[in-house]
Amino acid sequence: MAGKFCSFCGRDIQQVERLIAGPNNVYICNECIDLFHDLLRSDRKVRIKNEIKEIPTPAEIKAELDKYIIGQERAKKVLSVAVYNHYKRVFSNLDSNDVEIEKSNVLLIGPTGTGKTYLARILAKILNVPFAIADATPLTEAGYVGEDVENVVLRLLEAANFDVERAQYGIIYIDEIDKIAKKSPNPSITRDVSGEGVQQALLKILEGTIANVPPQGGRKHPYQEFIKVDTRNILFIAGGAFDGLEEIIKRRIQSTTMGFGAEIKSKKEMRLGEILKHVTPDDLVQYGLIPEFVGRFPVIATLDDLSEDDLVRILKEPKNAVVRQYQKLFEIDGVKLEVTDEALRIIARKALKRGTGARALKNVFEEMMIDMMFELPNLKNVEKVVITEEVALGKEKPIVVMRESA
């Protein structure tokens, strides 16, 4: 290759490590390849940053959350600050060799149906980033029947249509994280494959590593080619109900205040959310999470259990409230839907009794409306449908108001 030179930088073969030949006597050297690779990566990062747009301030993030989520003021503030700091860290460190700011993964603790998953989903929508939900329950450590922890990242890749660069700036919500707590604080002869082993396996991914992700889901396809995903800039939000954690917290609070004349509220006097606000990392370790795992979640936010008043507001106030959704469905048929305040309270009361929080609201409403929704398309000249307290109690049918004939 004497006399050959790079068509891009002009250096000859003696000045570079390697010269690669192309068609029509065109050559490119290894240094130009590295340069162009860096340029392409830089362009992709700029594209991703532009897609995420300007990072909203914590106040702006919370204002958007307020449109969809009723109550949970403290949790919304904590999440807004954590997400803002996360993406500020991501984009300030893209080309920086200065101080490295640690990740601000978030742990959400709260009763079932209080909006943990929904909070994470709305955050991703606000920021225009890929979002995926993974269930911690089927995860097991390598070598055991179940799902590999890398499948958590696979969910995000799928949500990003396998655009690796875009996925690397996404949000992953790991649900039921409390289910991988150690079953016992004492080590046993039998391996706890769904507990401590899974926590250990998740550590690297949570902190930031190059994960080898199986595009076809892992163990059933052992010979597939892995996709490398850098998890350093992925925000992990984990959530769980942590049933029984309140007892650990109460015991600690009572032992530290004993003998000082402090008034201890009984369990009946304290709402669950009020107790959970006092959680510490040590409480989580006692619950069954290993210290290293707890350390990967520097931000902890607790959610309040929902009251009847909260559920009434959730029914009608958010941007996508259940009542608004049904009113829109009726509107498409040219019919107004009216739900009285008394009916809303009965619906909220029924949902509260089911013990699954806000997620029960739509079920209760659907059960009440199914017959009306079935009959409505066949009815002519209907102006309005009214849902009263008696209808919500199941004692009467919805009131159908007909249009006056011209």
Curated annotation (Swiss-Prot):
A biological process term (GO) from this entry = proteolysis involved in protein catabolic process
SMART domains according to UniProt: AAA, ClpB_D2-small, zf-C4_ClpX
Keyword line: ATP-binding, Chaperone, Metal-binding, Nucleotide-binding, Zinc
Q: Tell whether Chaperone is among the UniProt keywords.
A: yes
This protein's GO CC annotations: HslUV protease complex
Q: Which residues bind ATP?
A: P111, T112, G113, T114, G115, K116, T117, Y118
For this chain, one GO molecular function annotation is: ATP hydrolysis activity
Q: Outline the subunit composition.
A: Component of the ClpX-ClpP complex. Forms a hexameric ring that, in the presence of ATP, binds to fourteen ClpP subunits assembled into a disk-like structure with a central cavity, resembling the structure of eukaryotic proteasomes.
Q: Which family does it belong to?
A: Belongs to the ClpX chaperone family.
Q: What role is this protein assigned?
A: ATP-dependent specificity component of the Clp protease. It directs the protease to specific substrates. Can perform chaperone functions in the absence of ClpP.
* Protein name (Swiss-Prot/TrEMBL): ATP-dependent Clp protease ATP-binding subunit ClpX
Species lineage:
Bacteria, Thermotogati, Thermotogota, Thermotogae, Thermotogales
Q: Which gene encodes it?
A: clpX
